[in-house]
Amino acid sequence: MLDLSLIMLGAGNSTRFGLQSKKQWLRTGDDPLWLYATKNISSNYLFKDVIVVSNECEYMRKFSSHFKFIKGGETRQDSLRNAISNINSEFVMVSDIARADIPKELITKLIESAHNADCIVPALKISDSVIYQNEYINRDELKLIQTPQLSRTNMLKKALKTDNIFTDDSSAIKAIGGTVWYIEGDERAKKLTYKDDLKRLNLNSPSNDIFCGNGFDVHAFKEGDFITLCGVKIPYSKAFIAHSDGDVALHALCDALLGAASAPDIGELYPDNDSKFKDIDSKILLQNSVNLIRSIGFDIINADITIIAQSPKISPYKDAMAKIVADILGIPLHKVNIKATTTEHLGFIGRNEGIAANAIVNLKYFNWRNVL
């Protein structure tokens, strides 16, 4: 049996993909694509180690305890270098999470060919005519290189000890004099690069699950002349004691969004001991939170916010608040509700020592089929 480990690369930003969600976070059923792709390959062989490379490692750990997670780098090569330093098996198979439909037959052919060269590479023949700088070139001399590629670990480690940039493992190994063996590739292993590529993948639609999140925040008062709630400045004889602008309503909303997605909370993402968040406009924090949950495959359904304050009166500002929130969340105005209540002069809120807010949000998976 081959002493073999698996590395799945998925630290890219999906800049060419053209959808709100990173491709690795598109859902097929309840699984994000990175998990689906990793399980698809790892189920076909008893790999010594399975390493997933990502920029969302802590979040990914919630989805599986069977894999190791390594932080990605600036480039594919940096990410691979980070991962392979944790590999001690004789051979390593490297694939891209963007190749989600790798067939079992291709994995088998790679493993059977492992001893033929330093790197085993699936490649497709080109059937169309090819032109380069207005000159037709012989397509029979060209190949489309795919992953996964299977390499001798020591050779790949050696090949990565360079500042030269390579787009795949085989070219790096070839550059140091290593040998490469080509096997027949598979159309099903083509890379998911643009959103239209989704049409050829045999993937289930996202599940119809709904995810509810709840957020709560409170801030005490100090002397001042206004407070900010849901992005609206309200004239008042006090101000919030806070590291940011103290917008309790938007802070609660941020936590509700993050909680529904089971993501890190507002204190972890925007700590109050970080100077870059000093006096920050909380609308920026909310926009960052929205961008995050969308990038990991969620859509926002609705938001319901309750502001708990003895004073000032909130009613005159509710419409302006709702519009700001709806614009940032990217949902219709009728799906945002702002409410206000008092504590009937009870407790610290009743004594006008501060204000609290509670927010509830519902999310669903981004349905990529609707944009094809």
Swiss-Prot record:
InterPro entries membership: IspD, IspD/F, IspD/TarI, MECDP_synthase, MECDP_synthase_CS, MECDP_synthase_sf, Nucleotide-diphossugar_trans
A biological-process GO annotation: isopentenyl diphosphate biosynthetic process, methylerythritol 4-phosphate pathway
Superkingdom to which the source organism belongs: Bacteria
Keywords in alphabetical order: Isoprene biosynthesis, Lyase, Metal-binding, Multifunctional enzyme, Nucleotidyltransferase, Transferase
Residues under site feature: Positions MEP for the nucleophilic attack: 139, 191
Site (Transition state stabilizer): 16, 23, 243, 342
EC number(s) per entry: 2.7.7.60, 4.6.1.12
CDD domains: CDP-ME_synthetase (cd02516), MECDP_synthase (cd00554)
Region (2-C-methyl-D-erythritol 4-phosphate cytidylyltransferase): 1-210
Residues annotated to bind a divalent metal cation: 217, 219, 251
Reactions catalysed: 2-C-methyl-D-erythritol 4-phosphate + CTP + H(+) = 4-CDP-2-C-methyl-D-erythritol + diphosphate; 4-CDP-2-C-methyl-D-erythritol 2-phosphate = 2-C-methyl-D-erythritol 2,4-cyclic diphosphate + CMP
Pathway: Isoprenoid biosynthesis; isopentenyl diphosphate biosynthesis via DXP pathway; isopentenyl diphosphate from 1-deoxy-D-xylulose 5-phosphate: step 2/6; Isoprenoid biosynthesis; isopentenyl diphosphate biosynthesis via DXP pathway; isopentenyl diphosphate from 1-deoxy-D-xylulose 5-phosphate: step 4/6
Record has Nucleotidyltransferase as a keyword: yes
GO molecular function: 2-C-methyl-D-erythritol 2,4-cyclodiphosphate synthase activity; 2-C-methyl-D-erythritol 4-phosphate cytidylyltransferase activity; metal ion binding
Positions of the UniProt region annotated as 2-C-methyl-D-erythritol 2,4-cyclodiphosphate synthase: 211-372
Family: In the N-terminal section; belongs to the IspD/TarI cytidylyltransferase family. IspD subfamily.
Protein name: Bifunctional enzyme IspD/IspF
Organism: Campylobacter fetus subsp. fetus (strain 82-40)
Source species taxonomy: Bacteria, Pseudomonadati, Campylobacterota, Epsilonproteobacteria, Campylobacterales
Primary gene name: ispDF
